């Protein structure tokens, strides 16, 4: 990690936004993404007892993808079509993957989900990491491919190579590095993990 670049980015950020992500100048962006409201919806829609109904879980998955500003308009209808095409067995597996991601063995859930999505050409970092991020925005990271590649290059994150196919191995290694970076800056920047990676993205412009 290039700590000098990170601290310089922090200083520049506070020069424009003295209150960090609580600064009024950033409110329009925060309102547009509405992560807090969607996060509360995800907590309710994906509560552990809801997983007794896999059909409902996959429909809720599609709903959150449609609502989210983090997913491209191009991918949203593809996810809706995927859910319509799925057999009951595939819906069960997607539901199991989401349960493991949120409540069980995260590595297994991650790989199962990537495998299911791959059958429909949708094994995308953004889609795999969306629900876990909304469910726990302080501990889980939303992974956006271009931003991720730029962060690795700009902040000199060595011994890690980005690949388009989502894997838990990369996710665990990359997010550990992000946590180390987050620990080096003010809590006014690092509370919401998408906000933190947004801060890093702004630093690279």
Which role fits each region the language model picked out?
Residues 1-120, 137-205:
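An N-terminal alpha-helical hairpin/helix-loop-helix interaction module that forms a charged
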Residues 115-132:
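Helix-hairpin-helix
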């Amino acid at each position: 990690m290039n700590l000098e670049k990170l601290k310089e980015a922090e200083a520049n950020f506070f020069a424009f936004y003295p209150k960090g992500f609580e600064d009024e100048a950033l409110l329009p962006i925060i309102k547009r993404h509405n992560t807090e409201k969607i996060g509360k919806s995800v907590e309710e829609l994906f509560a552990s007892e809801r997983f007794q109904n896999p059909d409902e879980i996959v429909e809720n998955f599609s709903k959150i993808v449609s609502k989210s500003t983090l997913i491209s308009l191009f991918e949203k209808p593809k996810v809706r079509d995927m859910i319509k095409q799925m057999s009951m067995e595939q819906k069960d597996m997607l539901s199991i993957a989401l349960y493991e991601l949120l409540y069980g063995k995260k590595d297994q859930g991650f790989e199962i989900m990537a495998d299911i999505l791959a059958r429909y050409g949708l094994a995308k970092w953004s889609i795999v990491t969306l629900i876990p991020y909304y469910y726990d925005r302080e501990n889980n990271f939303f992974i956006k491919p271009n931003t991720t590649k730029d962060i690795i290059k700009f902040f000199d994150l060595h011994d890690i190579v980005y690949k388009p196919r989502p894997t838990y191995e990369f996710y665990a290694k990359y997010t550990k590095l992000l946590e180390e970076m987050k620990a080096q800056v003010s809590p006014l920047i690092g509370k919401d993990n998408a906000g933190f990676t947004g801060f890093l993205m702004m630093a690279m412009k």
